[in-house]
Design a protein with these regions (language model features):
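Membrane-embedded multi-pass helical conduit in multi-pass membrane proteins
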Residues: 57, 63, 72, 79-87, ...
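Non-transmembrane catalytic domains and loops of membrane-associated enzymes and transporters
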Residues: 93-349, 477-499
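Compositionally biased, charge-rich terminal segments
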Residues: 46-48, 52, 208-221, 408-427
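Short hydrophobic helices that act as membrane-entry/anchoring signals
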Residues: 70-73, 77, 81, 225-232, ...
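Membrane-interface alpha-helices
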Residues: 447-473
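Multipass alpha-helical transmembrane domains of eukaryotic endomembrane proteins
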Residues: 330-332, 340-364, 409, 413-416
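N-terminal membrane-anchoring/stem segments of glycan-assembly enzymes
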Residues: 2-97, 246, 417, 439-443, ...
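Membrane-interface segments at the starts/ends of alpha-helical transmembrane spans
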Residues: 46-59, 351-358, 390-393
Length: 499
């Protein structure tokens, strides 16, 4: 100890990194260094500096245990995504895109991005593309179809702009074994369809999704598009890990997903899909992909996600603040669907227990995400009080600076898969941190406004109740008649073992 006392060196306060939950967790306090030589400090202060600054921090030890638990699950998720492998192409495929695939595109737009997307779909050689729109948009979309490929693109209409009714209308006019739903801005690589069809070689698979990346609207990504790209990169890891761990996925994204036509032709599905109500009162228009995913689980069908460059689609996001309205709509849909999966339908518990765990985690995530800054604020407050009056030894600025450094380091680590391909986006990490806290507050707001079922980002979306009533009354304006669906007998719905 004499050598230590006589030598100019550094001293440090050491605090345990803890947090209740979050991904990855942030600490309450941190290693805080002071570069003052020890020979300039009193003996009393040396003793204080060379021990753990305990004060009342032992009350947070249980939170540290939970934080360790969260780190462990984060590493498990990363490890599972690394060992995940996409299904390879079969030597003798059962399904050929030119014979077995119909692409259904519900839309009310006819912009330049739609034409680019249509060309990318045709590069995969599907048998047919069915565009379903409202009556007022038939002319512009028919012109677009004629300009791209009138032989393989067919335009149908419904009386009101309603995505679920548009999808159902397309299903009724499909004659192939596989349906692929696509957003009007989803741009595919030419290899996407073969890799998606490879999953259907397993007769237990009913739905297939893909990984995704953001396609910038302009020459450079805006901060909103970068935030969306961060979210998609994290999602790609999550869906790859859940697919590898228990074969499940919280949602087959509606941007592009493929299904067996025989499942969607079921009258029970079509009725439930177009008559979906929250709490029996509020009819749902968005959240179609959530409904489809839950239907796969509740009816014993397996799902798979092809996370690979060969099947990775590009999708545009709102390049401005309207991205937040998109996120709000998605968040409401997630609340509704997850609560149904966990507490009403309950098939997810036995079919995909890991996915059920992730859903439970999301229920508590907004609260636990806000615990960190709240506890840091408490420590900062205690640091402004004299020690004799029960305050803490650490200076308040030290706590804030250390917390900021910790958040930046952990969030950057979480985004490394994205930054590996786009290192220039590292400057947006602070924006991602702020967005995380905004998102936590927004999730709580979404929870208390689940009765709001509007689209939020698109004008012209019809009232779902009125649109459904028109469809039920047979008021749809049908396009050219299609031959009846040729039911393939090799498809047999697997038995539902989880009931």
């Amino acid at each position: 100890m004499k050598l230590l006392a006589d030598s100019p060196t550094v001293h440090c306060h050491v605090l345990l990194p803890v947090r209740v939950c979050g991904d990855p967790p942030a600490p309450l306090s941190f290693f805080c260094l002071s570069l003052t030589p020890l020979h300039c400090v009193s003996l009393h202060d040396r003793r204080v500096m060379l021990r753990l600054t305990s004060d009342h921090f032992p009350i947070f030890v249980p939170l540290g245990v939970i934080g360790f638990y969260r780190y462990l699950w984060y590493l498990i998720r990363i490890a599972a995504s690394l060992v995940y492998r996409p299904i390879p192409l079969p030597e003798n495929p059962t399904y050929i895109a030119s014979e077995d695939v119909t692409i259904i595109v519900p839309t009310i737009d006819a912009g330049d991005e739609f034409k680019e997307a249509a060309h990318s779909w045709l590069a995969g050689s599907p048998k047919e593309i069915i565009i379903v729109t409202e009556e007022n948009m038939r002319g512009p979309l028919q012109e677009l179809a004629d300009a791209v490929d009138p032989a393989r693109i067919r335009v149908l209409t419904v009386p009101y702009a309603n995505k679920r009714l548009q999808m159902a209308h397309g299903i009724k006019h499909t004659t192939t074994d596989i349906i692929v739903f696509a957003d009007d801005d989803a741009i595919w690589p030419p290899t996407l369809l073969p890799y998606v069809l490879a999953c259907f070689e397993d007769q237990r698979i009913g739905g297939v999704g893909t990984s995704q990346r953001v396609q910038p609207v302009g020459a450079r990504m805006t901060v909103w598009e970068v935030l969306a790209a961060f979210r998609l990169s994290i999602r790609n890891i999550e869906i790859a890990s859940s697919t590898h761990i228990d074969g499940g996925i919280p949602c087959l994204s509606g941007r592009t997903a493929a299904y067996r036509t025989v499942i969607l032709k079921d009258p029970a599905f079509l009725h439930g899909f177009t008559h979906d109500y929250w709490l029996g009162r509020y009819q749902l228009n968005s959240g179609d992909d959530k409904f489809l995913t839950r239907w796969m689980v509740s009816h014993g069908w397996g799902t798979y996600v092809q996370c690979c460059r060969e099947a990775e689609l590009l999708s545009t996001m709102k390049p401005n603040w309207r991205f937040l309205k998109q996120v709000l709509r998605w968040t409401r849909n997630t609340w509704r669907s997850d609560m149904r999966s966990l507490f009403t339908e309950r098939y997810i518990w036995t079919a995909h227990p890991y996915v059920a765990y992730t859903m439970v985690d999301k229920l508590f995530n907004p609260l636990t995400l806000l615990v960190g800054p709240c506890l840091v604020a408490y420590v900062v407050y205690k640091s402004t009080i004299p020690v004799a009056d029960g305050g803490y030894h650490l200076p308040w600025w030290n706590v804030i600076a250390s917390y900021a450094v910790w958040l930046t380091a952990t969030r950057t680590a979480k985004l490394l898969p994205h930054l590996w391909y786009r290192p220039q986006d590292i400057i947006y990490v602070p924006a991602f941190i702020l967005f995380g806290y905004y998102f936590a507050i927004m999730k709580l707001y979404a929870l208390f406004t689940l009765h709001e079922t509007g689209w939020g980002t698109r004008a012209g979306i019809g009232d779902p109740t009125k649109a459904t009533a028109a469809a039920d009354a047979g008021d749809e304006k049908l396009g050219p008649p299609a031959p009846a669906y040729h039911d393939q007998r090799q498809y047999e719905q697997p038995p539902i073992e989880m009931r």
